[in-house]
Amino acid sequence: MKDKAYDITIIGGGPIGLFAAFYAGLRGVTVKIIESLSELGGQPAILYPEKMIYDIPAYPSLTGAELTENLIKQLSRFEDRTTICLKEEVLTFDKVKGGFSIRTNKAEHFSKAIIIACGNGAFAPRTLGLESEENFADHNLFYNVHQLDQFAGQKVVICGGGDSAVDWALALEDIAESVTVVHRRDAFRAHEHSVELLKASTVNLLTPYVPKALKGIGNLAEKLVIQKVKEDEVLELELDSLIVSFGFSTSNKNLKNWNLDYKRSSITVSPLFQTSQEGIFAIGDAAAYNGKVDLIATGFGEAPTAVNQAINYIYPDRDNRVVHSTSLID
């Protein structure tokens, strides 16, 4: 059965894609979001759900999880004209009569216009690289923290020396029974002030050590074996939970198959966010132009322009004058 053609398909379900979908709903068009991950929200939802964000207009501060929740709630007003496809990676798209054919790893979709809001691309955690690691993943071995309270009263070991590792250690200090940070260097890569707070805290610091093995029963890790760098000293750390904070690798590997113009790993766009292919637009971190500022707030501002241009492309003969939301929603 042929999929119906949506007015606008948004590639990427992060903050910018979600707001673009909301604004498209506000303009009365049908929208499909295609997201490669298993949930909406992008990096704020996956990488820093409990870290504070301070540069969203009208919010002195809010967490990545709160930002995602608010955007999804905002979009739900137009759920009757919005379709969301999760765990789908866009491979290619081609111009066809009446729009575009979009091929993913699961299906073929049809759309009259496309807005690319995939950020820096799909991302995956950098792992320990140890045998049996995958067996413990998402049971009591984590690559990001969704809820601090889940570690209450636990012995927590954190591997890493960057901002996230240090931030999680400080955040868990008063929640967990104990927190131990294992880093391969004596010096930390995190912000100096955070490192000062860490060294003055009750967090146990083990440097320079590297993980060598994991021991456990079933799907639960019980001990992390570490070895001192350039020495034979080996320690076994008992743990209830292990957080691996080595960062995430991003990949826009499929971007190069989309036959657009690029600047490094981003898509070159016009002042109206038109790509080199008519009917296809790009916003957020996926878009490149002179003076670009890579902030969520910037992407929020780009979204309405891209949506309006997409509507002008789809319906050139329609009265497409933009009106304020106060005139559209009671």
Curated annotation (Swiss-Prot):
Record note on cofactor: Binds 1 FAD per subunit.
Assembly, in brief, is: Homodimer.
Superkingdom is Bacteria
**What Gene3D superfamilies would the database entry show?**
FAD/NAD(P)-binding domain (3.50.50.60)
A GO MF term: NADP binding
Instruction: Give the catalysed reaction(s), semicolon-separated.
Output: 2 reduced [2Fe-2S]-[ferredoxin] + NADP(+) + H(+) = 2 oxidized [2Fe-2S]-[ferredoxin] + NADPH
Record key words, sorted: FAD, Flavoprotein, NADP, Oxidoreductase
**Which species expresses this protein natively?**
Streptococcus pyogenes serotype M3 (strain ATCC BAA-595 / MGAS315)
Q: What is its EC number?
A: 1.18.1.2
What's the protein name?
A: Ferredoxin--NADP reductase
Q: What is the lineage of its organism?
A: Bacteria, Bacillati, Bacillota, Bacilli, Lactobacillales
Q: Name the family the entry cites.
A: Belongs to the ferredoxin--NADP reductase type 2 family.
Binding sites annotated in the UniProt record for FAD: 35, 43, 48, 90, 123, 285, 326
Instruction: Write down the required cofactor(s).
Output: FAD
Question: Which InterPro entries does UniProt cross-reference here?
Answer: FAD/NAD-bd_sf (IPR036188), FAD/NAD-binding_dom (IPR023753), Fd--NADP_Rdtase_type_2 (IPR022890), Ferredoxin-NADP_redctase_2 (IPR050097)
